[in-house]
């Protein structure tokens, strides 16, 4: 299994629309010239952006968090350029980018150091072969203070690994429950 390069990513975008929208370089400044958390293509990865749709966890109903029976009322929905995550809490968001993962590829997501160094952890499960959709992002605020996430700026890096052989059954083949997801997607069973 080998990691894929910037040249490979560009080719996959051109041939298969693997990442939409796609930024061929690293963007470090917004249109007004202000510094931002970078996004776009790096040597061996792609830095994704967070969209402006957030679900912030709240426990006002004092319910138990149950992945098999998740209560949608546990979240407050906001649409904003920033998201303030309460201390020791979390928020869900989605990528700006829509992904179409090739059958021979497994994609792993890692948080950006800019956020990690502030106690904000990004968690995403692997993107499996032939999965497609917006990626749902989970941000954990591990600090005792409110934490800020910026929409339309870099939040995590996707790494693409190619297998030595094609998988027998892809995510699409088995009818994965998150196939084609758009927007922030809550747990499904």
Curated annotation (Swiss-Prot):
<dbReference type="Pfam" id="PF22769">
    <property type="entry name" value="DCD"/>
</dbReference>
<dbReference type="InterPro" id="IPR011962">
    <property type="entry name" value="dCTP_deaminase"/>
</dbReference>
<feature type="binding site">
    <location>
        <begin position="112"/>
        <end position="117"/>
    </location>
    <ligand>
        <name>dCTP</name>
    </ligand>
</feature>
<comment type="similarity">
    <text>Belongs to the dCTP deaminase family.</text>
</comment>
<protein>
    <recommendedName>
        <fullName>dCTP deaminase</fullName>
        <ecNumber>3.5.4.13</ecNumber>
    </recommendedName>
</protein>
<feature type="binding site">
    <location>
        <position position="157"/>
    </location>
    <ligand>
        <name>dCTP</name>
    </ligand>
</feature>
<dbReference type="GO" id="GO:0006226">
    <property type="term" value="P:dUMP biosynthetic process"/>
</dbReference>
<dbReference type="GO" id="GO:0015949">
    <property type="term" value="P:nucleobase-containing small molecule interconversion"/>
</dbReference>
<comment type="subunit">
    <text>Homotrimer.</text>
</comment>
<dbReference type="InterPro" id="IPR036157">
    <property type="entry name" value="dUTPase-like_sf"/>
</dbReference>
<dbReference type="InterPro" id="IPR033704">
    <property type="entry name" value="dUTPase_trimeric"/>
</dbReference>
<feature type="binding site">
    <location>
        <position position="181"/>
    </location>
    <ligand>
        <name>dCTP</name>
    </ligand>
</feature>
<dbReference type="GO" id="GO:0008829">
    <property type="term" value="F:dCTP deaminase activity"/>
</dbReference>
<comment type="function">
    <text>Catalyzes the deamination of dCTP to dUTP.</text>
</comment>
<feature type="binding site">
    <location>
        <begin position="136"/>
        <end position="138"/>
    </location>
    <ligand>
        <name>dCTP</name>
    </ligand>
</feature>
<keyword id="KW-0378">Hydrolase</keyword>
<feature type="binding site">
    <location>
        <position position="171"/>
    </location>
    <ligand>
        <name>dCTP</name>
    </ligand>
</feature>
<feature type="active site" description="Proton donor/acceptor">
    <location>
        <position position="138"/>
    </location>
</feature>
<dbReference type="GO" id="GO:0000166">
    <property type="term" value="F:nucleotide binding"/>
</dbReference>
<keyword id="KW-0546">Nucleotide metabolism</keyword>
<keyword id="KW-0547">Nucleotide-binding</keyword>
<comment type="pathway">
    <text>Pyrimidine metabolism; dUMP biosynthesis; dUMP from dCTP (dUTP route): step 1/2.</text>
</comment>
<dbReference type="GO" id="GO:0006229">
    <property type="term" value="P:dUTP biosynthetic process"/>
</dbReference>
């Amino acid at each position: 299994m080998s990691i894929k390069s910037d040249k490979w990513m560009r080719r996959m975008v051109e041939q298969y629309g693997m990442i939409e929208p796609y930024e061929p370089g690293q963007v470090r400044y917004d249109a007004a010239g202000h510094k931002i958390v970078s996004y776009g293509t790096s040597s061996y990865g792609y830095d994704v952006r967070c969209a402006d749709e957030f679900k912030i966890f709240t426990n006002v109903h004092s319910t138990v968090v149950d992945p098999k029976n998740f209560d949608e009322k546990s979240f407050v929905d906001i649409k904003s350029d920033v998201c303030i995550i309460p201390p020791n809490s979390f928020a869900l968001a989605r990528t700006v980018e829509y992904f179409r993962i090739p059958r021979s590829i497994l994609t792993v997501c890692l948080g950006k150091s800019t956020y990690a160094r502030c106690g904000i952890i990004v968690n995403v499960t692997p993107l499996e072969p032939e999965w497609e959709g917006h990626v749902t992002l989970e941000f954990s605020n591990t600090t005792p203070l409110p934490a800020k996430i910026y929409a339309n700026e870099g939040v995590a890096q996707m790494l693409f690994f190619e297998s030595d052989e094609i998988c027998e059954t892809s995510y699409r083949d088995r009818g994965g429950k998150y196939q084609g997801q758009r927007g922030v997607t809550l747990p499904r069973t």
